[in-house]
Each structure stands twice: as structure tokens, then as C-alpha cells.
């Protein structure tokens, strides 16, 4: 059985092999290590690279008085990359990634808002890791207690469990080959 790190690395390898030219949003101020050729003011080619230091959740955990499931910290603390367009059982998913340390801080701010919303709604705490491409309101989330990967609508509870673990879910995701940068 693969570790989560091995599953993440294997997915990144499949992605690089199957999507030889990758595009992402260009944020000039970030000076991201993934950036390659700048296509235009909003678009850049990218190549994934390992984070020199994993995204640190300690301050957020302290502020929210909670611990995040280890799979969440591992997913967002391993690679810098553009978001990954994936196919999961015939459904296109955008798996969120961080492009740089600055983007990681932005992600932590967004996670904070999501957790506070869940608490206000008295729902189990989840962390979003992706979006359903068919509908922006459909989130791919990790249940913070169990680590299960599932689907939920914004503001609702997880309604469909896709996998009991992130590693198993990632092993079943395949790169979605895009035909051009505007796909």
C-alpha cells in the first residue's frame, strides 16, 4: 500500500507525463518557482517543484484551536504547482495546489473562512481541496475528523464520500488533458 506522499508524487509524475505543457494564472508579485514562459499578463507555463519547506499550519491550528487532518497538511505542503485538472470516474475535478509561499498563505486564509463558515452552520469541519469543474459550487473536501474525501455544495455538509482516504482517491484520479490554454 502506498503512502500519501507516494500517491501525491505518482499523481504529479502522471500529470507531467500526460500534460507536457501546463498553464496557470500568472501572479507577477509571487515570483513562483513553478513559473516558466509567460504567455500573457494572466497566463504562464508551469512546472511543479517540491516545496523547500512544507506549508506550515501551526499558527492556523493554534488560532482556530484545532488540528488539521494530516492528509490536508501533506497535500498542501508537498509541491508547488498550478491547479491540476483531473478526471475522477468521468468527472472533471480541479485539484487545488499552491504556487508559492505567498499562495500558501492565501490558501490558509481561505481555509480559515471555510472552517468559520462550517462552525457557524454547525456542520462537520471539512477542508476544500478541489472544485467540480461542471459547477463551481461543488467542492471536493476532506472531512477533518475521518480524512474521507467527498463532495459538498458550498454551505452544505459533505453528501457523497468518494474515498475513505486521500491516497486512495488520488490513485484513482487521472490527468485531464487540455487542448489549449483557454480550456
Curated annotation (Swiss-Prot):
InterPro entries: Syd, Syd_sf. It is found in: Cell inner membrane. Its main location: membrane. CDD domains: Syd (cd16323). It comes from the Bacteria. One of its GO terms (cellular component) is cytoplasmic side of plasma membrane. Keywords: Cell inner membrane, Cell membrane, Membrane. Signal peptide: none annotated. It is a peripheral membrane protein. It holds the Pfam family Syd. The keyword Membrane applies. Belongs to the Syd family. HAMAP family: Syd. Interacts with the SecY protein in vivo. May bind preferentially to an uncomplexed state of SecY, thus functioning either as a chelating agent for excess SecY in the cell or as a regulatory factor that negatively controls the translocase function. This is Protein Syd. It comes from Idiomarina loihiensis (strain ATCC BAA-735 / DSM 15497 / L2-TR). The gene is syd.
Amino acid at each position: 500500500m502506498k503512502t500519501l506522499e507516494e500517491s501525491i508524487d505518482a499523481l504529479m509524475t502522471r500529470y507531467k507525463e500526460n500534460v507536457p505543457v501546463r498553464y496557470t494564472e500568472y501572479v507577477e508579485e509571487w515570483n513562483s518557482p513553478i513559473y516558466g514562459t509567460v504567455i500573457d499578463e494572466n497566463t504562464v507555463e508551469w512546472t511543479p517543484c517540491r516545496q523547500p519547506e512544507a506549508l506550515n499550519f501551526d499558527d492556523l491550528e493554534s488560532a482556530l484551536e484545532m488540528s488539521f487532518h494530516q492528509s490536508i497538511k501533506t497535500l498542501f505542503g508537498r509541491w508547488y504547482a498550478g491547479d491540476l485538472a483531473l478526471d475522477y470516474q468521468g468527472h472533471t475535478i480541479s485539484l487545488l495546489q499552491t504556487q508559492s509561499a505567498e499562495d500558501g498563505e492565501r490558501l490558509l486564509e481561505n481555509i480559515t473562512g471555510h472552517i468559520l463558515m462550517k462552525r457557524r452552520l454547525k456542520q462537520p469541519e471539512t477542508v476544500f481541496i478541489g472544485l467540480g469543474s461542471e459547477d463551481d459550487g461543488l467542492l471536493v473536501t476532506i472531512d477533518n475528523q475521518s480524512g474521507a474525501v467527498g463532495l459538498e455544495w458550498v454551505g452544505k455538509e459533505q453528501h457523497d464520500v468518494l474515498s475513505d482516504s486521500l491516497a486512495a482517491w488520488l490513485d484513482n484520479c487521472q490527468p485531464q488533458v487540455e487542448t489549449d490554454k483557454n480550456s
